[in-house]
Amino acid sequence: MALLEVKNLKKVYTTRFTQNQVQALTNVNFSVNKGEYVAIMGESGSGKTTLLNILAALDKPTSGQVLLHGKDITHISEKEIANFRREHLGFVFQDFSLLDNFNNRDNIFLPLVLSKKKYPEMKERLTPIAKQLGIEGILDKFPYEISGGQKQRVAVAR
């Protein structure tokens, strides 16, 4: 079974004043298996952001399914959506969204603290990720003390 499966995804926006319909996504289908990496590329206005917003449960499709571990996330409640985002998604923004008054370790721990994880679990989760991303040596530094590439890796670890 695929980790993520997108079936016949369609998104149509209706303009506010003229009521014109703009089709942002048409019959999008793909699957992602565990361990695979996916890049979404396309021209400006091709629907990349719309697709990502639907995958992140920030927007609903007009029709179609988004299956994560076999569960259709397009039909879950607002409370379930918040839990889904916290437990299954990670966002890496272009500006990194790191807090300069927190060291890198605390920036990584922040979403775990908000999820009420205990310190031993946070430390256990951080160790292999920091090693894999090559950031063990910068965990006690602050974001303003590291390079852009290192900031990106800290954001990925978070």
Where is each model-derived feature located?
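ABC family nucleotide-binding domain
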Residues: A2-R158
